[in-house]
C-alpha cells in the first residue's frame, strides 16, 4: 500500500523523480500480487499501482537512496544486511516522516509508535486506517526528498 501511495504522490511533484520498489524481508509471498483488500482500498482512494512481491536483498542498498520500513522486524532485518554505515543511514521507518511522529528516535523505547500495523486479513476499515497513516508519512517523506535534493 505504501508503494502505491508513494509512487502516485511522488509523480505529482513537478521536477521530482521517485522510483518506488517494494519488498519484504522474508520470501513468503514472492511473485504474488497485493492482498485484494489492500488493493481495493488504495484504488478507492484514487491510487493506481501494480504490485508483485519481492524479497529485500543486500544489493538493494546499491540501487536505492532511501530504504523505508514499516515495522521493527523489517527495520532490524534490513539493517542486518547493511554492509556499512552509509547503508544503515539509508534506512528509516516510513512513519518517522509523519510530522506528528518525526521527533521519535527509532532506537528509543518509543520505536513502536513508528510502526505501521499490518492489516492483513482484517476489515476494510483497518486497511483504511493504515492508508491514512501511510499518506501522512508519505507527504512528509516527499518533503524530505525535496529538501535533500535542494541541499
PLM features per residue range, with description:
Residues 1-64, 143-150:
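Conserved active-site segments centered on acidic
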Residues 72, 77-151:
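Phosphate-binding/catalytic loops
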Amino acid at each position: 500500500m505504501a508503494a502505491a501511495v508513494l509512487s502516485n504522490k511522488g509523480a505529482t511533484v513537478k521536477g521530482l523523480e521517485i522510483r518506488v520498489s517494494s519488498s519484504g524481508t522474508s520470501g513468503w509471498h514472492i511473485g504474488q500480487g497485493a492482498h485484494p483488500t489492500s488493493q481495493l482500498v488504495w484504488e478507492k482512494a484514487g491510487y493506481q499501482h501494480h504490485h508483485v512481491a519481492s524479497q529485500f536483498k543486500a544489493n538493494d542498498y546499491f540501487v536505492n537512496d532511501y530504504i523505508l520500513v514499516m515495522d521493527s522486524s523489517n527495520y532490524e532485518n534490513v539493517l542486518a544486511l547493511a554492509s556499512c554505515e552509509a547503508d544503515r543511514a539509508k534506512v528509516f521507518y516510513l512513519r518517522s516522516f509523519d510530522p506528528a511522529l518525526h521527533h521519535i528516535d527509532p532506537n528509543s523505547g518509543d520505536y513502536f509508535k513508528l510502526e505501521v500495523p499490518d492489516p492483513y486479513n482484517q476489515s476494510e476499515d483497518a486497511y483504511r486506517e493504515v492508508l491514512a497513516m501511510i499518506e501522512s508519512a508519505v507527504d512528509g517523506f516527499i518533503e524530505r526528498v525535496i529538501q535533500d535534493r535542494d541541499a
